[in-house]
Amino acid sequence: MQVDLLSSAQSAHALHLFHQHSPLVHCMTNDVVQTFTANTLLALGASPAMVIETEEASQFAAIASALLINVGTLTQPRAQAMRAAVEQAKSSQTRWTLDPVAVGALDYRRHFCHELLSFKPAAIRGNASEIMALAGIANGGRGVDTTDAAANAIPAAQTLARETGAIVVVTGEVDYVTDGHRIIGIHGGDPLMTKVVGTGCALSAVVAACCALPGDTLENVASACHWMKQAGERAVARSEGPGSFVPHFLDALWQLTQEVQA
């Protein structure tokens, strides 16, 4: 199994495209992470929108550049709105991304996520346990936390990618991004990133935005992982713990965009 690396030039090119196109991202995400997700997208140059009412969600999915479905705080009314948005996204050819939070631990969201797979997401982003559960290989995880190493989920990610046509991202100490054939590994980041709620969910929003960019979607999505890890490393070097990490992280994302424009 060959795992390729992403070059700095590829990452910089994707970030230039990101800033140039400034995707409008319809984020149907969980209640815990909305502000952090919106600020992450803004720092990178995208435009976030959090539209959740069923009728509006369907309407907005038709005009957005990309759609994110994150099931972290799933309810039946929210599932109805998400389903309507995904149906409209498919009809309007709006590329959408699934973040199957805790899908291995809870039946309702697992069935819902499996239902959504028939609408062909452009990307799926989860930790190892979530990706393995979604692929039907295991029902693991401890709530939103993984109990598996990212590398162990690569075969499941490849299978899921081939079955759905999605780019699948497995996040961990090393992030792995695959289209079912090629695999890109992204090293970096810092363990402190796991002590801040929302870094993974925010990454899913950036992944969704990258799916709207022209060019190689696999490389664009892998670049999203690279930017987040880069920013995490820079933020950790300047912070004293989780509380001071967040503002430094947002600053680091902003600085990355300034560097590619210089």
UniProtKB/Swiss-Prot annotation:
Pfam family, one: HK
EC number(s) per entry: 2.7.1.50
Coiled coil spans: none
Record-level Gene Ontology MF annotations: ATP binding; hydroxyethylthiazole kinase activity; magnesium ion binding
Residues holding substrate: M50, G198
Keyword Transferase: yes
Gene Ontology biological process: thiamine biosynthetic process; thiamine diphosphate biosynthetic process
Lineage top rank: taxon: Bacteria
Keywords: ATP-binding, Kinase, Magnesium, Metal-binding, Nucleotide-binding, Thiamine biosynthesis, Transferase
Alphabetical list of InterPro entries matching this protein: Hyethyz_kinase, Ribokinase-like
Pathways per UniProt: Cofactor biosynthesis; thiamine diphosphate biosynthesis; 4-methyl-5-(2-phosphoethyl)-thiazole from 5-(2-hydroxyethyl)-4-methylthiazole: step 1/1
Cofactor(s) required, per the database record: Mg(2+)
Enzyme class: transferase
Sequence positions that bind ATP: R125, T171
Reaction catalyzed: 5-(2-hydroxyethyl)-4-methylthiazole + ATP = 4-methyl-5-(2-phosphooxyethyl)-thiazole + ADP + H(+)
UniProt entry tagged with the keyword Chloroplast: no
Role, per record: Catalyzes the phosphorylation of the hydroxyl group of 4-methyl-5-beta-hydroxyethylthiazole (THZ).
Family membership: Belongs to the Thz kinase family.
Protein name: Hydroxyethylthiazole kinase
Lineage per the UniProt record: Bacteria, Pseudomonadati, Pseudomonadota, Gammaproteobacteria, Enterobacterales
UniProt gene name: thiM
